């Protein structure tokens, strides 16, 4: 093995050359990239000893291995020459170059963008991180980061049913067992987020998982990864590309719109490859579909026929277009680009082959149109061996079955007639005539005449054009597409010529002149003339006229033509009646069919009738939907004006509505809508007033309001255009009227009150707005059952509860008088101002009575419960009479009890702003005398009352936000609900008894001998009423609008100078604290009841402040006495108050429950 020389040199330290060789051997045997400088055995500076695995102990052994393994050592030395090595910079630059070249590589058969372009599209102007942890990037597909995937509660809230973990075991460490109990299906894909990782192997599996989750389970899928920007995004994009046929850029941008994704470049490269593969597969599929038939328009665009039929189908499905609309658009796009289906040479070759094979069996072909029918309709079933042709035929059959089913033989006979009548003309000329008209025909009609053309070309020489079913259908389809190609070229050529010469060329041809004539005569004949008409008059047509044109397209104007009568149709631009081609029931397509037959010289109405059968089934859904809409609107009109009994046919057949539809009648609709809409407000008013009078047993018929002069069409109908203009005028006038009324409301309640009665008939809706003052709830409470009373929104006080139970007769009477005649019917052009004035006076008298009583009660109850007025009343102590005080308290307590017992409507009367309330007082010092005083006196009192309302230091609801005009407005509107609570006037008697829950309290000389029991009673009453109103609020569907306005806002917004705030008494604070603690058990009701108390107290203070201005001295003395009574009651134990209040609350609850059951 070793020579002598080798043995001698054994002890020599290896030379440089040997070192190089040793390194090479090490690299070869050990694959050790950088051997240690020191030997592991002896720490000697010898590299050979390091190679323990092959036990080389000397440089000789290394040399021998080098000699054996690497024959020319010189070459190795040269390769290691430093001059030959690339520097690190060069290597980096080269690597960068290679990477950029890969990223910019856009070599693709299908124009797939390069990776760099994809990255630019994703980054756009800046790179973003996702805003949210989870985003829904496709319906029911969520991309999320790790934190969402491990948050089971959030998954449950999102409704996730499937989880695709793109970082299974590589970042998101969950698994099927992690989601046990959540009914979540899990698929984990173990992929690292590195460019060199192959994620494409998981594309198909992940996409199928997503597809199954979405389609089979109708679930929601969460695709999770570490950050939700790379791996998960790539899997979702692959799903969109595979199952939704998206191109790579479209799929990426679809996801990017919803979430900032940034797949790494390796993944983008794999998506590119997937895109190429999918495009190739689809091209092969399309090639199989149309390759045999040679009917391809280009790469994967489908057959010409398929495109046309698709266009037809899309148009049919489009709601805003008819089944004929848009046909000219389709024509333009198809004809503007001459379509090259196959090369001419290729076509010639195929044609020759076809002729050879076809000659054998030509004698077996039937001699009428049935042969072509069997060729087309029988082909799919009989020639299953040829899948490609079968596919095309099935597509054709499924989409055109309604045309093929009945008509081919008739078409054949028709074509024969055409040939006889047109014997002198050549086939080419015939074809040119057809293609002339093709630029103007609809998509569906185009399909028909293509078939006819094929028939016609088949007929002259059956030996050349026919073949039996057993023949190769491929060649027949080639021939057919060849003819189709010729037709299309001619059509496009003709189309371009026409577009240049406009209609000048049309005049030269029969078809062109006919088309122009039709276009002038009627908008309803052909879809393409519709298109031209609309494009020419696009700027002139209103929305209504466009709708009418659409209606003609839909064929509704011809609905009743089967009987032979034609209803006049006022045109959009030209009011020319629609021509009736025949007495047959026609649709737009059938109209075209007849015209087309006239063009080519024959007319076959039976065929058109046959076509109608198929077409009706095709358009059934759409027509059914329209008819249902029309029927529904007709029923709505009939219900709201039941006098009108006009037929649906006349309304649907013509674009007009009978005059009788607009006369208000005896309506029966229940108004639960938003009465802010002008027309609905008026109609609700009229028919609800009718309902109210019926309930009262005094039903009267609503007087009909005369219509303005409208242009009347045939059959006593009105043109819809004129109706539209007229309605616009009425609406604008009504709006102006409403604005004027609102201005009146802000000026004086007596003027404003004319709105209270009609509006009152609307059942407790959230009428117009709180400021506008239509307190329509006032009568609503009478109309509704007790348990359903709807409290109209606003910050009413406790006492606003009507005592309708105690005064049914009065409420009925006021109902009848208030609403038996509607002041405004649906389209009121004239208003009886005298009647309004009379009603206003009656109402105002009632309101003044009720409000004076109410005001007294409120003040009494308020001052009984609060010592806030103590300081103000000291000065004018002497002026007040005891009688008034007793009367106040009496009425107040009675009203409390009545209101808490009768869970009738909580009306919208707020505490009736201080201005109006004090005006009621101003007209007389005695409440009893108020009943007779007139509106003029009331108004004069209003004018003299200019003192600002009193502002408290705890202003309650939105009172502080209103200016004087809105206070007046609110007063008027809300006090109207006291119309029927007349029974309170009996409570003026200072010795009257009032009953609540079988509890009789004698409140005669209350203030001379007030005791702690009475104080407790008052607390009990006030609190229980708050509770009662809040609990009744539960059952009412109407929202309550309670606001707590801070005192500062009231001071800022009130236009009048402020009075100094009165100090808050300890007694009131006690009451408030106890009410807070008691109401806390009511949860959300607590703040409502408290603000309820506050608004009430605030209204009372305003009223009291106004009264204090020198008007009601006697009342003031009693108030002062009441305040001193309150001071006595301050010593009362809070526990007693709470106990009494709770007892009262329980009683109220039981009563409410009973009332609900009743």
UniProtKB/Swiss-Prot annotation:
Domain of life of the native organism: Eukaryota
Subcellular location(s) of the protein: Cytoplasm, Myofibril, Sarcomere
Modification Phosphoserine occurs at: 377, 509, 985, 1036
Phosphoprotein among keywords: yes
Composition bias type Acidic residues, residue spans: 8-19, 877-890, 1126-1135
Keyword annotations of the record: Cytoplasm, Phosphoprotein
Region described as Disordered: 1-21, 280-303, 315-337, 360-392, 407-444, 492-527, 559-582, 597-622, 873-915, 940-1135
Residues recorded with modification Phosphothreonine: 433
UniProt-listed Pfam families: DSPc
Keyword Ligase: no
GO molecular function: MAP kinase phosphatase activity; protein tyrosine/serine/threonine phosphatase activity
Residues in Tyrosine-protein phosphatase domain copies: 132-280
Entries under InterPro entries matching the protein: Atypical_DUSP_subfamA (IPR020405), Dual-sp_phosphatase_cat-dom (IPR000340), Prot-tyrosine_phosphatase-like (IPR029021), Tyr_Pase_dom (IPR000387), TYR_PHOSPHATASE_DUAL_dom (IPR020422)
Ranges annotated as biased composition (Polar residues): 322-337, 897-914, 952-966, 990-999
Positions with biased composition (Low complexity): 435-444, 974-983, 1000-1012
Biased composition (Basic and acidic residues): 500-517, 600-619, 1044-1056, 1064-1079, 1094-1111
An annotated GO BP: negative regulation of MAPK cascade
GO cellular component: cytoplasm; sarcomere
Protein task: May be required for myofiber maturation.
Family note: Belongs to the protein-tyrosine phosphatase family. Non-receptor class dual specificity subfamily.
Protein name per its UniProtKB record: Serine/threonine/tyrosine-interacting-like protein 2
Organism: Homo sapiens
Source species taxonomy: Eukaryota, Metazoa, Chordata, Craniata, Vertebrata
Gene (name only): STYXL2
């Amino acid at each position: 093995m070793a020579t002598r020389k080798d043995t001698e040199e054994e002890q020599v330290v290896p030379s440089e050359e040997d070192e190089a060789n040793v390194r090479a051997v090490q690299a070869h045997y050990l694959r050790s990239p950088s051997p240690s400088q020191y030997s592991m055995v002896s720490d000697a500076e010898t590299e050979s000893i390091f190679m323990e695995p092959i036990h080389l102990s000397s440089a000789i052994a290394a040399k021998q291995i080098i000699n054996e393994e690497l024959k020319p050592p010189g070459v190795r030395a040269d390769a290691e020459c430093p001059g030959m090595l690339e520097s690190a910079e060069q290597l980096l630059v080269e690597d960068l170059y290679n990477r950029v070249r890969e990223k910019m590589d856009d070599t693709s058969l299908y124009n797939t963008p390069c990776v760099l372009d994809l990255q630019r599209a994703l980054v756009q102007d800046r790179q973003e991180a996702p805003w949210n942890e989870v985003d829904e990037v496709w319906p029911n597909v969520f991309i999320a980061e790790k934190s969402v995937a491990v948050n089971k509660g959030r998954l449950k809230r999102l409704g996730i049913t499937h989880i695709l973990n793109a970082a299974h075991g590589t970042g998101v460490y969950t698994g099927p067992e992690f989601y046990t109990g959540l009914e979540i299906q899990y698929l984990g894909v173990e992929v690292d987020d590195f460019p060199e990782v192959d994620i494409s192997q998981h594309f198909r599996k992940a996409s199928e998982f997503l597809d199954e989750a979405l389609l089979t389970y109708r679930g929601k899928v969460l695709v999770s990864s570490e950050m939700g920007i790379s791996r998960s995004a790539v899997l979702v994009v692959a799903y969109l590309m595979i199952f939704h046929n998206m191109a790579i850029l479209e799929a990426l941008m679809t996801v990017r719109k919803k979430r900032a994704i940034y797949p790494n470049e390796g993944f983008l490269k794999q998506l590119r490859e997937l895109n190429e593969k999918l495009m190739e597969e689809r091209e092969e599929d399309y090639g199989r579909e149309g390759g045999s038939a040679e009917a391809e328009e280009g790469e994967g665009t489908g057959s010409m026929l398929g495109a046309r039929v698709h266009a037809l189908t899309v148009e049919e499905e489009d709601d805003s277009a008819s089944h004929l609309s848009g046909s000219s658009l389709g024509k333009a796009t198809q004809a503007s680009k001459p379509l090259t289906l196959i090369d001419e040479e290729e076509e010639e070759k195929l044609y020759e082959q076809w002729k050879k094979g076809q000659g054998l069996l030509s004698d077996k072909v039937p001699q009428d149109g049935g042969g072509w029918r069997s060729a087309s309709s029988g082909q799919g079933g009989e020639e299953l061996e040829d899948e490609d042709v079968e596919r095309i035929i099935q597509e054709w059959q499924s989409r055109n079955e309604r045309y093929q089913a009945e008509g081919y033989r008739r078409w054949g006979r028709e074509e024969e007639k055409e040939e006889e009548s047109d014997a002198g003309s050549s086939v080419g000329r015939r074809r040119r005539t057809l293609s002339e008209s093709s630029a103007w025909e609809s998509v569906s009609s185009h399909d028909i005449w293509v078939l006819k053309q094929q028939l016609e070309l088949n007929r002259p020489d059956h030996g050349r054009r026919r073949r039996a079913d057993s023949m190769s259908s491929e060649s027949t389809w080639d021939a057919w597409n060849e003819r189709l190609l010729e037709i299309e070229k001619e059509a496009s050529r003709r189309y371009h010529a026409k577009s240049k010469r406009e209609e000048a060329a049309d005049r030269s041809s029969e078809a062109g002149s006919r088309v122009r004539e039709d276009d002038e005569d009627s908008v309803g004949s052909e879809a393409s003339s519709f298109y031209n008409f609309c494009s020419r008059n696009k700027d002139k047509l209103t929305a209504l006229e466009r709708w009418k044109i659409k209606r003609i397209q839909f064929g509704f104007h011809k609905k009743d033509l089967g009987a032979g009568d034609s209803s006049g149709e006022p045109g959009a631009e030209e009011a020319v009646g629609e021509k009736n081609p025949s007495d047959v029931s026609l649709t737009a397509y059938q109209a075209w069919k007849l015209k087309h037959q006239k063009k080519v010289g024959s007319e076959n109405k039976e065929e058109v009738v046959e076509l109608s059968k198929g077409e009706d089934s095709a358009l059934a859904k759409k027509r059914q939907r329209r008819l249902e809409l029309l029927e529904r609107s007709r029923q709505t009109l009939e219900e709201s004006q039941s006098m009108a009994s006009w037929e649906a046919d006349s309304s649907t057949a013509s674009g007009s509505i009978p005059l009788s539809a607009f006369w208000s009648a005896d309506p029966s609709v229940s108004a639960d809508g938003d009465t802010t809409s002008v027309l609905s407000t008026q109609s609700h008013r009229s028919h609800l007033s009718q309902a109210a009078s019926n309930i009262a047993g005094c039903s009267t018929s609503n007087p009909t309001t005369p219509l303005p002069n409208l242009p009347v069409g045939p059959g006593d109908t009105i043109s819809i255009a004129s109706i539209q203009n007229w309605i616009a005028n009425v609406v604008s006038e009504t709006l102006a009227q409403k604005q004027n009324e609102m201005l009146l409301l802000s000026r004086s309640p007596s003027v404003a009150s004319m709105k209270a009665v009609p509006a009152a008939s609307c059942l407790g809706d959230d009428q117009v707005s709180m400021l506008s003052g239509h307190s329509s709830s006032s009568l609503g409470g009478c109309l509704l059952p007790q348990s359903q009373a709807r409290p109209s929104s606003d910050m009413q006080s406790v006492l606003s509860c009507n005592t309708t139970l105690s005064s049914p007769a009065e409420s009925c009477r006021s109902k009848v008088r208030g609403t038996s005649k509607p002041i405004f019917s649906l389209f009121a052009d004239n208003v009886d101002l005298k009647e309004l004035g009379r009603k206003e006076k009656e109402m105002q008298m009632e309101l003044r009575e009720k409000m004076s009583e109410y005001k007294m009660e409120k003040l009494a109850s308020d001052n009984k419960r609060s010592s806030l007025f103590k300081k103000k009343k000291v000065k004018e102590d002497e002026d007040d009479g005891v009688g008034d005080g007793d009367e106040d308290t009496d009425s107040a307590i009675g009203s409390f009890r009545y209101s808490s017992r009768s869970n009738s409507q909580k009306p919208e009367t707020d505490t009736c702003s201080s201005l109006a309330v004090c005006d009621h007082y101003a007209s007389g010092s005695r409440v009893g005398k108020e009943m007779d005083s007139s509106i003029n006196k009331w108004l004069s009192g209003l004018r003299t009352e200019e003192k600002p309302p009193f502002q408290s230091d705890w202003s309650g609801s939105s009172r502080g936000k209103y200016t004087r005009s809105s206070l007046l407005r609110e007063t008027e509107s809300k006090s109207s609900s006291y119309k029927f609570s007349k029974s309170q006037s009996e409570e003026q008697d200072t010795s009257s008894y009032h009953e609540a829950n079988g509890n009789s309290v004698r409140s005669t000389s209350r203030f001379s001998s007030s005791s702690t029991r009475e104080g407790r009673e008052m607390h009990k009453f006030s609190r229980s009423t708050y509770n009662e109103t809040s609990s009744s609020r539960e059952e009412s569907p109407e929202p309550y609008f309670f606001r707590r306005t801070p005192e500062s806002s009231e001071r800022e917004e009130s236009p009048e100078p402020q009075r100094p705030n009165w100090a808050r008494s300890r007694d009131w604070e006690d009451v408030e604290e106890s009410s807070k603690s008691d109401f806390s058990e009511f949860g959300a009701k607590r703040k409502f009841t408290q603000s309820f108390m506050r608004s009430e107290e605030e209204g009372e203070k305003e009223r009291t402040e106004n009264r204090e201005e020198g008007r009601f001295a006697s009342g003031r003395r009693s108030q002062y006495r009441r305040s001193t009574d309150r001071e006595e009651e301050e010593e009362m134990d809070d526990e007693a108050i709470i106990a009494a209040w709770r007892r009262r609350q329980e009683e109220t609850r039981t009563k409410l429950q009973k009332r609900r059951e009743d």
